[in-house]
């Protein structure tokens, strides 16, 4: 059996990835596929933390554009990530993977509050930990949550699993047929060229803490395991 390249990872799942082709809500087939892929790497003794977005249910930015108070709209988005996290927890536990959800906003009836040392202990016991409710603060994306939690738990890498693209391109491949995929990038490249990998706050946090990022498609089964084993998939972003 191949040895994993990374021992502790943060898997970043967009909310849209959980919606699948239906584009909204939670697609049971997709969430089951993601859970099975997480199980594959957990069985390699990789410590797995997950950050899930909420865009399949609600986006704070859209609410703000509709005239809502931005902070209130963002809090709604955080609650959407909790719904996704509980669905993923259920799917993982149905296939025998012990999972804990930790939320940045306290809701003890459904999940643990986020406590860094407790999260690390869960990981050391080979439990999957899902970080929900973003950072607990409005104006911060779940990409920034992934970068922040990766720094806090000293993860080796962030695995950014996308549903509509298999890496980072110099243009939108769904619009421009000449778009070229990057094999490797630096965070400075991402920031300078405005590439839509993650927002600038998240990119800067990863750069400052020297956390590598792999962007790949989650829709192809086995890709999460391939990324953990260090196979050449997607786009790798690192350093300055």
From Swiss-Prot:
The name this protein goes by in its record: Uridylate kinase
Coarse class of the protein's main subcellular location: cytoplasm
Biological pathway: Pyrimidine metabolism; CTP biosynthesis via de novo pathway; UDP from UMP (UMPK route): step 1/1
Entry GO MF terms: ATP binding; UMP kinase activity
Annotated GO biological process: 'de novo' CTP biosynthetic process; UDP biosynthetic process
Catalysis: reaction(s): UMP + ATP = UDP + ADP
Residues annotated to bind UMP: 54, 74, 135-142
Subcellular location, record wording: Cytoplasm
């Amino acid at each position: 059996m191949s040895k994993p390249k990374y021992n502790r990872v943060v898997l970043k799942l967009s909310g849209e990835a959980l919606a699948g082709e239906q584009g909204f809500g939670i697609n049971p087939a997709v969430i089951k596929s993601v859970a099975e892929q997480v199980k594959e790497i957990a069985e390699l003794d990789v410590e797995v933390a997950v950050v899930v977005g909420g865009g399949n249910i609600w986006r704070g930015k859209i609410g703000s554009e509709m005239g809502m108070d931005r902070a209130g709209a963002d809090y709604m988005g955080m609650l959407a990530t909790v719904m996704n996290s509980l669905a993923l927890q259920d799917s993982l536990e149905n296939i025998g993977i012990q999972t804990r959800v930790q939320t940045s906003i306290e809701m003890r009836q459904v999940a643990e509050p986020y406590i860094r040392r407790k999260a690390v202990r869960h990981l050391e016991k080979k439990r999957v930990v899902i970080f929900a409710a973003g950072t607990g603060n409005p104006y911060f994306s779940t990409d920034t949550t992934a970068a922040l939690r990766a720094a806090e738990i000293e993860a080796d890498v962030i695995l950014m699993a996308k549903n509509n693209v298999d890496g980072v391109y110099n243009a939108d491949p769904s619009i421009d047929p000449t778009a070229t995929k990057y094999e490797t990038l630096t965070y400075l490249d991402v920031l300078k060229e405005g590439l839509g990998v993650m927002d600038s706050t998240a990119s800067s946090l990863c750069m400052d803490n020297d956390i590598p990022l792999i962007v790949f498609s989650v829709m192809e089964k086995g890709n999460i395991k391939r990324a953990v084993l260090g196979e050449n998939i997607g786009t790798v972003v690192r350093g300055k």
